[in-house]
Design a protein with these regions (language model features):
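A short beta-loop-alpha structural element at the N-terminal edge
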Residues: 1-15
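Active-site rim helix/loop that mediates acceptor-substrate recognition in acyltransferases
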Residues: 23-44
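Conserved beta-strand in the GNAT
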Residues: 45, 51-60, 71, 76
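A conserved beta-turn-beta hairpin within the catalytic core of GNAT-like acetyltransferases
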Residues: 61-72, 82, 129-130
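Conserved acetyl-CoA-binding loop-helix of GNAT-fold acetyltransferases
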Residues: 77, 83-96, 119-123
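Residue-level recognition of the GNAT/N-acetyltransferase active site
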Residues: 78, 111
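Conserved active-site alpha-helix within GNAT-family acetyltransferase domains
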Residues: 88, 112-132, 136
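Conserved GNAT acetyl-CoA-binding A-motif
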Residues: 98-109
Length: 138
């Protein structure tokens, strides 16, 4: 059975066993340590017998003039565990956590050609919008 775990500083050992394709890059312990203690940074891991097979990362986005939002930053599932409803369970759990923390809306982005992601977001009544995306060096 897949267990969903809200990540806190006490759950760091879960990052020792991660299936391929759950994260975009190899885990950096210094980044994980900084992430889990940062207020407003949330992560849920899907764990199968001690192996991380999915992750959903989000950030609380506060505005001076709008409701508090939950930005879904990453959602990934190991290829071996796709099409089992894990991504849907993780995003539903993240929405619940966001509501507990006062979020009223959520938003995210995905590639236009990511068929699986677009299907998931339509299934949870996501409203597709248009926007331009830019990456800038700092």
């Amino acid at each position: 059975m897949i267990e969903l775990v809200r990540i806190t500083p006490t759950a760091m050992s879960l990052f020792d066993r991660i299936a391929d394709e759950v994260f975009d890059e190899p885990i950096r312990p210094d980044c994980v340590s900084a992430y889990v203690v940062e207020p407003g940074h949330l992560m849920i891991l899907a764990v199968d017998a001690g192996l991380v097979v999915g992750q959903c990362a989000a950030v609380i986005h506060r505005h001076p003039d709008k409701v508090t939002e939950l930005y879904i930053d990453e959602l990934g599932t190991a290829a071996t565990h796709r099409r089992q409803g894990i991504a849907r369970r993780m995003i539903d759990a993240m929405f619940e956590w966001g509501r507990e923390l006062g979020c009223k809306e959520s938003w995210l982005g995905t590639e236009l050609d990511n068929v699986a992601a677009n299907a998931l977001y339509r299934a949870i009544d996501g409203r597709r919008d248009t926007m331009a995306y830019y990456e800038l060096e700092l």
